[in-house]
Amino acid sequence: MELGPLSDIASEPGVTDIAVTCDGTVWADRGQGMRPHALRVPFSGPQAIRDFAVRLCSQLGRRLDDACPIADASTVEGVRVHAVIAPLVPQGAAISIRLPDVVAPSLESLAENGMFPSGWMPLLEGFVERRASVLVTGGTGAGKTTLLKAMLMRCAPGERVITVEEVRELGMLNHANHVSLVTRGANMEGKGAIGLSQLICATLRMRPDRIVVGECRGGEIVDLLRALNSGHRGGMTTLHANQVTAVPSRLVALGLLAELNPQAT
């Protein structure tokens, strides 16, 4: 993927996120929060930012224009691009890019970096080996997807892993028998959309050993629960929740979106 003026900062070790605001300011997160970054050749103006955003999305097969002013796109490797153009922003475009780890995360490296106590290692490994259903929760930027991917790396090589995502963030796993499914938006006529719920249902006919949903944010939680309760063990997903105590209410809220009785969750 060609990142143009952002190529240098994107290639720096430790950079996880890059953002471009509509005034042309570039921000980068090197693990300590967003900090401004000076480009060697800055954007010349709002139109240059917009043109750059359109080119980024076009590379990844997504439209970004007056008819479709918001775009989400990703590469097979897990680089994620989100862009919004004027008039939804004051001028130009607002661009957000999330970069995957250059080296696939491992549970050992995450423990060494302080994501969780080293004493949790046997517990997490046991979840994978016993094919337990796993729900990874946390706030924005907490590393939910990173931990999920590290756990998937512990799956037996022969397992058939089906991943379902709105935007491909997990990237390609080290499994020969891995299928990565992503949703599709509607076309100009408002037809052809394929959502998470449809994809989860499709996985049931794909002989999965594990069904993995990148993140549950809506009624698709019901389809995943049905899959896990129908004999498909070892499923995994993530859920946004700032505190563990908020998880039950979040699950109930998502279930209500699919008209599920609160007692069922």
Positions of PLM-derived features:
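Generic beta-strand/beta-sheet core signal
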Residues: 21, 29, 98, 137-139, ...
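P-loop (Walker A) phosphate-binding loop of NTP-binding proteins
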Residues: 127, 139-140
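Hydrophobic positions on the alpha1 helix immediately C-terminal to the Walker A/P-loop
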Residues: 147
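P-loop NTP-binding catalytic core
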Residues: 25-130
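Switch/coupling sub-region of P-loop NTPases
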Residues: 131-134, 150-265
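Active-site phosphate-binding and catalytic loops of NTP-dependent enzymes
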Residues: 2-8, 56-73, 159, 258-264
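N-terminal anchoring/assembly modules that precede and organize ATP-driven motor systems
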Residues: 1-38
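Conserved lysine of the Walker
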Residues: 144
